[in-house]
C-alpha cells in the first residue's frame, strides 16, 4: 500500500500519490485539454506492456502472447508477482522472469558462440556486469563456470546514472547563458527553462558519446532569447570528472562486496544506455589490470548495443524454453534446483617448486568435472598431488631503472623521496593436500591427464593416466577428509 512506498527514488520525476484507501498512483495530464487524471501504478505498467506487446507484434507480423521478462536483481518476489499480474492484464503471459545482468551476460555469451568463439563462452571466468541506466546503476559480479552462472554479489545506486551526467551539462549551460544574459535571469529558476535544458542536455550527452563535439540549441530558453553553446567532448569529460570517478568507485565497491580483488575480474560487461559513454570505459581500462577485458562500444567495435543486451538475453531465453510446459519451467526455477553447493576454494594439483595449478576454480557449482594435462619433459615416475588451494595477492616493489648515479637536469630531490611503485599479482598456493597418486614410467616428453570430479556431496574422485598409455590410477576423497563448500 501507499504507506509502504519509499518516494525518495521519485524525487527527480513524478511523485506518487495516494489513490483511494491505500492505492498508489500518479496524477497525469492527458488529451488535448491536458486534463488531470489519476492513474494507478499497475495501470502505468499495463499501458507500457501493452505498448511493448504491440510493437513486438508489428515487428514480427503476428500476435505475441507470452514473453520472458527481465527484472532488476533487487526485485522482490512481490514485485515480480505484481509485474506478472500487470502483464497478464496487458495480454502477456510471463513464462519466466530473469535478472537483467544474467540476461545481458547470456546475450554476450550467445554472441561469442555465434561468432565462432564458442569455447570462450564456456571458460571459467568472473564477469562483472555493470548496468548503467538513465536514473540508476546496478552491478552484478557473476562467476561463469562452464556456462552456469552464479551471482556472487550485487550493488545498486538509485542516484547514479545518465541523468547525473545530464545535470553537469545543465549546470554548465545555465551558467554560460547567465553570463551573457544576466538581465534575462537564471534559467535554473524557471521550470520551463529547466525542462528545455534537461531535454537538450540528454541529446548533447548522447551526441558526445559518438562524436567529439556537440551543441546546445534551444529556442526561447527564457525571456524569448535563443541559446546555442558548443561543447567539446574534452570539456564535457573535464566537467563530469567527479561523476565518472563515481562510476569507477561504485564498480570497485561491488568487487569488494564479492570479497574479490580487481585482479580476479576477467571481464567487465557494460550494459545500459549510459554505457555508450567512452570515458566510463576508458576509466575502467586504466583502473583495472590489462588482464581484464572491458566490453563496451567505445573500445570493442563488435560489442552488442548495450541498450539491447538484456532484452536480447530475454529473447534468447524465451527461444530456449518456449517449447517447455509451464509446470516444467516453474519446477526448474525452484530453490531446490537453483541453490546448489559450490566449491569454496579452488582445487588443483601441486607442481614443482610448490606451484599450484587450478583445475576446478572456486565458486564452481557441483557436480562438476574438469580435466587438465601435465607435460612431463623428462619422463619417468610422476607424483600427482591433488590439493585444495587459496588465492593470494602478491605485492612487490617495482625496480627503478638504473641511472649509474647520474641525474637528469629535470630530476629533483623530491623525486627520490617518492615511494616505489607497487606491482600486484594474483598467485595460487596449496592450502591442504587431499590425495596423492603416482604414475610410473611416463615416456620422455609425454603428458599425464588429470581428471577431477566433484560430486554433489562435495566428495572428489580423481583419475590420472598417461596420455596414449594404458591403465591409470583412480580414487575417491570423501568430503569429511577436507573439502570445503558453500550453497549459492
Go through each PLM region and give its residues.
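Oxyanion-binding/catalytic loops of NTP- or PPi-dependent enzymes
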Residues: 1-9, 17, 32-38, 57-488
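Intrinsically disordered, low-complexity, Ser/Thr/Glu/Asp/Lys/Arg-enriched terminal regions and linkers
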Residues: 21-26, 305
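Glycine- and Gly-Pro-enriched alpha-helical subdomains that act as flexible
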Residues: 26-30, 36, 43
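Membrane-embedded glycan transfer/ligation machinery
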Residues: 46
Amino acid at each position: 500500500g501507499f504507506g509502504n512506498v519509499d518516494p525518495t527514488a521519485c524525487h527527480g520525476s513524478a511523485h506518487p500519490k495516494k489513490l483511494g484507501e491505500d492505492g498508489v498512483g500518479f496524477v497525469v495530464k492527458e488529451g488535448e485539454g491536458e486534463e488531470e487524471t489519476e492513474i494507478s501504478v499497475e495501470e502505468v505498467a499495463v499501458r507500457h506492456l501493452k505498448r511493448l506487446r504491440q510493437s513486438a507484434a508489428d515487428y514480427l507480423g503476428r500476435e505475441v502472447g507470452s514473453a520472458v521478462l527481465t527484472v532488476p536483481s533487487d526485485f522482490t518476489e512481490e514485485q515480480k508477482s505484481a509485474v506478472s499480474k500487470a502483464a497478464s492484464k496487458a495480454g502477456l503471459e510471463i513464462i519466466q522472469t530473469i535478472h537483467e545482468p544474467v540476461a545481458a551476460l547470456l546475450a554476450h555469451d550467445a554472441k561469442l558462440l555465434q561468432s565462432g568463439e564458442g569455447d570462450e563462452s564456456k571458460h571459467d571466468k568472473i564477469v562483472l556486469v555493470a548496468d548503467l541506466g538513465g536514473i540508476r546503476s546496478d552491478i552484478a559480479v557473476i562467476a561463469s563456470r562452464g556456462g552456469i552462472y552464479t551471482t556472487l554479489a550485487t550493488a545498486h545506486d538509485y542516484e547514479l546514472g545518465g541523468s547525473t551526467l545530464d545535470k553537469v551539462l545543465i549546470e554548465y549551460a545555465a551558467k554560460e547563458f547567465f553570463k551573457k544574459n544576466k538581465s534575462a535571469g537564471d534559467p535554473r529558476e524557471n521550470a520551463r527553462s529547466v525542462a528545455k535544458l534537461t531535454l537538450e542536455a540528454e541529446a548533447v550527452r548522447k551526441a558526445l558519446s559518438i562524436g567529439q563535439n556537440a551543441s546546445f540549441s534551444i529556442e526561447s530558453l527564457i525571456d524569448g532569447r535563443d541559446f546555442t553553446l558548443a561543447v567539446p567532448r574534452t570539456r564535457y569529460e573535464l566537467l563530469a570528472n567527479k561523476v565518472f570517478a563515481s562510476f569507477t568507485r561504485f564498480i570497485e565497491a561491488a568487487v569488494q562486496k564479492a570479497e574479490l580483488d580487481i585482479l580476479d575480474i576477467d571481464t567487465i560487461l557494460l550494459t545500459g544506455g549510459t554505457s555508450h559513454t567512452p570515458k566510463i570505459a576508458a576509466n575502467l581500462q586504466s583502473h583495472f589490470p590489462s588482464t581484464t577485458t572491458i566490453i563496451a562500444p567505445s573500445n570493442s567495435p563488435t560489442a552488442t548495443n548495450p541498450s539491447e543486451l538484456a532484452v536480447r538475453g530475454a529473447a534468447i531465453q524465451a527461444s530456449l524454453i518456449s517449447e517447455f510446459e509451464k509446470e516444467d519451467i516453474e519446477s526448474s526455477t525452484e530453490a531446490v534446483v537453483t541453490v546448489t553447493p559450490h566449491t569454496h576454494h579452488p582445487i588443483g594439483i601441486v607442481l614443482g617448486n610448490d606451484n599450484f595449478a587450478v583445475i576446478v576454480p572456486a565458486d564452481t557449482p557441483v557436480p562438476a568435472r574438469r580435466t587438465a594435462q601435465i607435460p612431463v619433459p623428462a619422463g619417468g615416475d610422476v607424483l600427482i598431488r591433488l590439493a585444495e588451494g587459496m588465492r593470494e595477492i602478491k605485492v612487490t616493489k617495482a625496480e627503478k631503472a638504473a641511472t649509474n648515479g647520474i641525474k637528469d637536469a629535470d630530476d629533483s630531490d623530491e623525486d627520490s623521496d617518492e615511494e616505489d611503485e607497487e606491482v600486484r599479482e594474483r598467485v595460487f598456493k596449496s592450502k591442504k593436500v587431499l590425495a596423492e597418486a603416482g604414475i610410473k614410467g611416463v615416456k620422455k616428453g609425454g603428458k599425464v591427464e588429470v581428471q577431477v570430479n566433484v560430486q554433489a556431496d562435495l566428495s572428489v574422485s580423481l583419475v590420472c593416466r598417461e596420455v596414449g598409455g594404458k591403465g591409470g590410477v583412480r580414487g575417491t576423497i570423501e568430503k569429511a577428509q577436507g573439502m570445503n563448500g558453500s550453497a549459492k
